């Protein structure tokens, strides 16, 4: 803050009450031209990419150059290098070659006239070429609506077709000649496209007309233009609705003439059973099936053997109506229901690697002599009937009872057993009980220990809480022990209350004499009106609170007994 104005005088404790000299305020004045010439005036300038240097800019201060665009350094908004000269947005219509007419010097007129009349006669103007392809014959009177197609022409002039070929008599005749359903839909699509292109041509004509009129006079009133636009658009919509109605009637006639195809149910093949059925009973063999419901059999490959099955391998709650052949090998996850037919020892499927909740019902007789003991990789809470065989699994099971003689082959057992790696029911050693009790003792907060100051010559003592009235409410002074002790060289009794602290501060210190009011108050309180300590100047209400009402009665009796 180098430019901050400094204090003109020093203000301290010696001259703070002295009057300051009034400060003369100056006035702003305009500097002369000579002073301005000597000053250096700097202006902030924007750095432009590819611009001139700072020296050139300083020299060009007096020149009023055109301001450059902020985005002049950005080439994205620039025009392409080989772009042609900018022209009218509808310049593509200038290259359209109009058909030959009887006179080469005849001017052309748009088919859509927006309320602007011409002074030329009907004999001087032939049929013109329309952008939207509607042939018209010009007349002297202004026409608010576009001229319809006319059969009569002037001077033998033929009506010209549209440059877009939208309204063509040949197309209309060909579309009316078709009667099939496919040709009818194609014709309706063409007619819809014709309607859209007609509306687009109408919009282009309006925009071109508006641009021409705005170029001549920007103050012209355009209300007649939009009125004529509404009329032209309504005519196009009426024509389109007429085409749509005729197309619908032709389609209805074509459909009424089509023969109705009949499908015989008896000739259809029976429906094949699906591979996966969820809660749906299988249909009995030989039942009639819809011809559209035919589905191929599902082929299931397991290893190198391909087996085509007609019954579902995975069935949830469904019951098969006939005995299905048992596959050679079962699935890794066995979720199939047990077939109703009797299973032989040779056809018994192998046990699943992961079996969730399935009970092993195989007996010792059905097992071959050369086969290894069948065990599950992971068995969750299962009980096997083969208790006499050891478990060869790396993980012997979670919550499964041990096998008996083969306990040594177990890797980890999460059961209540005596193995070294037992995580089932871990019993802590007995020696750890003592440290646990010590930790509990350490968690308890330490009690405040203090040495109570005891009055040896006291004839009565009682622990109480002292309240002294200040203004309108009682204030807590503290908890202590009340003592009644005789005064030396006197028959009077001293009432002393010491706080339960190491210092034993005196809370109440007075002599019991006649005239001190004392009474019971509340449930367990004794009220006295006295001077609590010699330091107090005036008497106030003193409230002594004990634990029970009996103790309060006993305390009141002792105090009244020793008042003399």
From Swiss-Prot:
GO terms for cellular component: chromatin; nuclear membrane; nuclear pore; nucleoplasm; polytene chromosome band. Residues 77-475 are annotated as: 9 X 2 AA repeats of F-G. It is found in: Nucleus, Nucleoplasm; Nucleus envelope; Chromosome; Nucleus, Nuclear pore complex. Sequence repeats lie at residues 77-78, 114-115, 164-165, 278-279, 316-317, 356-357, 380-381, 398-399, 474-475. Residues 77-92, 110-123, 177-192 have a biased composition (Low complexity). One of its GO terms (molecular function) is chromatin DNA binding. InterPro entries: NPC_Nucleoporin (IPR053074), NUP2/50/61 (IPR015007), PH-like_dom_sf (IPR011993), Ran_bind_dom (IPR000156). Residues 455-564 form the RanBD1 domain. Residues 24-38 have a biased composition (Basic and acidic residues). It is a peripheral membrane protein. Residues 1-197, 237-279, 339-383, 425-447 are annotated as: Disordered. One of its GO terms (biological process) is positive regulation of transcription by RNA polymerase II. Keywords: Activator, Chromosome, Membrane, mRNA transport, Nuclear pore complex, Nucleus, Protein transport, Repeat, Transcription, Transcription regulation, Translocation, Transport. Pfam families: NUP50, Ran_BP1. Residues 1-13, 149-165, 243-256, 372-383 have a biased composition (Polar residues). Residues 39-48 have a biased composition (Basic residues). The keyword Membrane applies. Gene3D superfamilies: Pleckstrin-homology domain (PH domain)/Phosphotyrosine-binding domain (PTB). Component of the nuclear pore complex that has a direct role in nuclear protein import. Actively displaces NLSs from importin-alpha, and facilitates disassembly of the importin-alpha:beta-cargo complex and importin recycling. Binds to transcriptionally active chromatin sites when located in the nucleoplasm and is involved in transcriptional activation. Contains FG repeats. FG repeats are interaction sites for karyopherins (importins, exportins) and form probably an affinity gradient, guiding the transport proteins unidirectionally with their cargo through the NPC. FG repeat regions are highly flexible and lack ordered secondary structure. The overall conservation of FG repeats regarding exact sequence, spacing, and repeat unit length is limited. This is Nuclear pore complex protein Nup50. It comes from Drosophila melanogaster (Fruit fly).
């Amino acid at each position: 803050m180098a430019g901050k104005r400094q204090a003109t005088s020093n203000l301290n404790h010696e001259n703070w009450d002295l009057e300051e000299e009034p400060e003369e305020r100056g006035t702003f004045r305009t500097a002369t031209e000579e002073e301005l010439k000597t000053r250096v005036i700097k202006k902030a300038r924007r750095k432009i990419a590819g611009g001139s240097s700072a020296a050139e800019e300083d020299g060009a201060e007096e020149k009023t150059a055109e301001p450059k665009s902020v985005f002049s350094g950005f080439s994205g908004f620039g025009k392409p290098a080989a772009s042609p000269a900018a022209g009218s947005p509808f310049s593509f219509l200038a290259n359209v070659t109009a058909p030959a007419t009887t006179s080469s010097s005849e001017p052309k007129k748009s088919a859509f006239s927006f309320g602007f009349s011409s002074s030329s006669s009907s004999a001087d103007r032939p049929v013109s070429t329309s952008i939207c392809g509607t042939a018209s014959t010009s007349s002297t009177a202004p026409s608010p609506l576009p001229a319809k197609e006319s059969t009569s022409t002037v001077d033998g002039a033929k009506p010209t077709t549209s440059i877009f070929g939208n309204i063509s008599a040949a197309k209309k005749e060909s579309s009316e000649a078709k009667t099939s359903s496919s040709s009818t839909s194609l014709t309706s699509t063409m007619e819809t496209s014709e309607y859209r292109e007609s509306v687009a041509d109408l919009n282009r004509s309006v925009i071109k007309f508006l641009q021409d009129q705005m170029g001549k006079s920007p103050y012209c009133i355009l209300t007649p233009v939009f009125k004529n636009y509404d009329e032209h658009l309504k005519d196009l919509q009426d024509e389109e609705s007429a085409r749509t109605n005729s197309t619908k009637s032709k389609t209805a006639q074509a459909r009424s003439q089509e023969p109705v195809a009949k499908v015989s149910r008896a000739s259809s093949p029976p429906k094949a059973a699906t591979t996966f059925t969820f809660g749906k009973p299988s249909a009995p063999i030989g039942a009639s099936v819809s011809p559209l419901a035919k589905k191929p059999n599902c082929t299931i490959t397991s290893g190198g053997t391909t087996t085509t099955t007609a019954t579902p391998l995975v069935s949830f709650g469904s019951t098969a109506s006939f005995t299905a052949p048992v596959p050679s090998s079962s699935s890794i996850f066995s979720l199939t229901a047990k077939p109703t037919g009797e299973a032989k020892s040779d056809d018994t499927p192998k046990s699943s690697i992961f079996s969730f909740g399935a009970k092993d019902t195989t007996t010792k007789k059905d097992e071959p002599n050369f086969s290894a003991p069948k065990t599950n990789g992971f068995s969750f809470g299962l009980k096997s009937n083969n208790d006499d065989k050891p478990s060869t699994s790396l993980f012997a099971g979670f919550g499964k009872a041990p096998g008996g003689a083969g306990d040594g082959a177990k890797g980890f057992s999460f059961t209540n057993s005596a193995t070294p790696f037992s995580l089932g029911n871990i019993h802590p050693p007995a020696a750890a009980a003592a440290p646990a009790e010590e930790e509990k003792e350490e968690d308890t907060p330490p009690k405040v220990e203090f040495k109570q100051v005891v009055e040896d010559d006291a004839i009565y003592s009682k622990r109480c809480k002292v309240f002294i009235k200040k203004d309108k409410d009682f204030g807590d002074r503290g908890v202590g022990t009340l003592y009644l002790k005789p005064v030396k060289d006197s028959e009077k009794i001293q009432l002393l209350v010491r706080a339960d602290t190491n210092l034993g501060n005196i809370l109440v210190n007075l002599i019991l004499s006649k005239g001190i009011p004392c009474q019971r108050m509340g449930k367990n309180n004794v009220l006295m009106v006295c001077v609590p300590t010699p330091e107090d100047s005036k008497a106030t209400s003193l409230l002594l609170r004990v634990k029970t009402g009996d103790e309060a009665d006993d305390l009141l009796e002792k105090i009244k007994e020793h008042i003399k």
